[in-house]
Amino acid sequence: MARQVKRRPHASARPESSSDSKKPKLKHGRHQMRTVTRTARRPGQQDFEEESQDTYDNQQLGEDGQNDEESEDEQEIEQESGKAYEALLTLLKSDHKESKPARKSDKVEENQDEEEEDDEEIAGANVQNEEDQDNEDDNEDDEDSARGLAQDPLEAHFNRVEDSYIDNQERLVIKEREKWTTVEKKTYDNLGYSSLTQSPPGRAISIPSKTKVKISDFFIKKRVLDAFEATYPSDFEKLSPLDLALLEPMMKYQDINFPYKTFSNTSYRKLYALHALNHIYKTRDRIIKNTTKLNNYREALKNGTANLDSQEPEFRDQGFTRPKVLILLPTRNSCYELVELLIKLSGCEQQENKKKFMNQFYAKELPPDTKPLDFRDSFKGNNNDFFCLGLKLTRKSLKLYSSFYSSDIIIASPIGLSMILENPDKKKRQYDFVSSIEVLIVDRANQIEMQNWENVATVMRYVNKIPKDFHDADFSRIRMWSINDQSKLLRQNLIFSEYLTPNINNLITSKSFNIGNKTKFKPIINSNNCIMNSIGLKLKQIFQRFDSPSPVSDPEVRFKFFINTVLPSLMKSSSYSDGIMIFVPSYFDYLRIKHHLKSSTKFNFGSIDEYSSQSKSTKARQQFMAGKINIMLYTERLHYFRRFEISGVKTMLMYGLPSNPVFYKELVRFIGKSVFREQCDLDLAFVKILFSKWDAVTLERVVGNERAHALCNSPNELFEFR
């Protein structure tokens, strides 16, 4: 009888034992990993294979059920695998306690679940890391084979690329930083978009292409197609032109930067949800199929029916860890909406831990009706921005709160994930579970940017980083480009935002290395549909340009121009000595201006920002409205989070254009409110905006592309609109 080898916990939490101490320490350095040429086992290792079946295959496959009685060793392993979640649990309990009013109908349920909630506060702490044997017999594999795996974009992008090709692309794209070339430009006049596709230096991955009209024309798993048809029957028959233009590069695993223009446009979400599920199911089924082939070969070898001259088949179809899709979202409510969509499109009959998920992520609360519609959409429901959730897909169920290392999809806020990746307690830091991400999705990027973009930068540093521990990974199944730290060259990045900003553009232009091409969408904004035309107020709007040599020096040049040219003449140019608001987009510029006004001028001013207390904000606004404060400093992030309607504004000075064009409209209407109350004259009030040529993208959203080009390139520096 073959002896059994006990499975080990994750290396990061492996208990010390005498047997471990005797084993030589493996070298996992970058040099050692790059010199690997073959890791598949030889036929001579048959006996060892029978004795110790690698657990990583089982983790990748998943199972539908689990025995109720588990050994103590199994339970210990499950608890160790939840360490990343426990780090987030500790932080949430200390800093982010939530209070929910008790409902009579829930009292009994709450008492029953009280103990469970204490143990599993957030994101799968102490959730068992079950090993699912999901032996799905799927007829879709036969269909895929008939259509030809060579035509499948997933196979072409991840599994059929040559190692020598990736090595060469790494040299050109990352090491030598050669320029990408534009290979295609499209204009969708009836959709209000244009697109630009760029190809990496050398050559892009070749993806077979044919004309597609409906969603069934794409290589999508039948179970996902059936669920999509049941949920969106009209879209199943024929996709809208915009959805088709977006889905085609998405299914080819190209990077995409897509501004959806308005919060009410949510159609793109069903597309990336479908794409993520399709990627998970196809990857899992490929692993199952290859594992079956390996097992058949080993069984034949054991029975003596195999060809002894043939080598064991080699299948490189995995990464270091199981999670393949990472989705970054700003709030728990946005996570709730996405999970509901994933459940609909997954085709799963059961959902595990759904009640717990509803309790922690769903809320009925809505912002006041007096707030703008986009504000109500952003902050509806549970707007807590601290979460990290694992989702595991099996043949019949979708499990919420699965441990990170047994999850297929990770949905997280940037701050929630970054607190795990860079936990202050070094012993609790975990980042191995994002080492094998193949599809990265950032949705509602503008909301995330308003929270703290540094957390996104933190996440990007750890995605596809070589893991510090290998968690019983079977190196004979890991793709060579993963072992050689080249995953970033194959990872697809999908970025969705309401409007484009330098930070968001940078994710695709500078932080993306996907050699499968990148497609950037851009809204067509002209003088007819720009935000300026929707103000409904014939107010003088003065745009003043200053010369700035580079984006890096722009903040310094802007500040000097402001204090030397604009500020000294501010009181003279304004028809009113009070009611002057200075709007500052950047918090750092705001602090600098505030310090200058306080130390170098005698202006009677007040200031409110996103960190001001409620009492201070209320007092400053009242004093400004009463004329006790002549000048008010006001930040963009404060406006985003509170949407104040400031009274008493007679003159508006914008230190820079707001990134959100809707804010420009709302700020200008502050003056309209004063005009309506007869606090100032429409002909005497005005708005003045400072800008440089580096503000062209933001300027275009306000005045339109034709005017923006003229404002940035005209010999004149002063422009007036009404």
From Swiss-Prot:
Q: Where in the cell is it found?
A: Nucleus, Nucleolus
Comp. bias regions, Basic residues: 1-11, 24-33
Keyword annotations: Nucleus, Ribonucleoprotein, Ribosome biogenesis, rRNA processing
Q: Name one GO biological process term.
A: maturation of SSU-rRNA from tricistronic rRNA transcript (SSU-rRNA, 5.8S rRNA, LSU-rRNA)
What is this protein's record name?
Answer: U3 small nucleolar RNA-associated protein 25
Superkingdom: Eukaryota
Provide a Gene Ontology MF annotation, just one. U3 snoRNA binding
Where is region (Disordered) located? Answer: 1-162
Q: Which family does it belong to?
A: Belongs to the UTP25 family.
Organism lineage? Eukaryota, Fungi, Dikarya, Ascomycota, Saccharomycotina
Q: Assembly and interactions?
A: Component of the ribosomal small subunit (SSU) processome composed of at least 40 protein subunits and snoRNA U3.
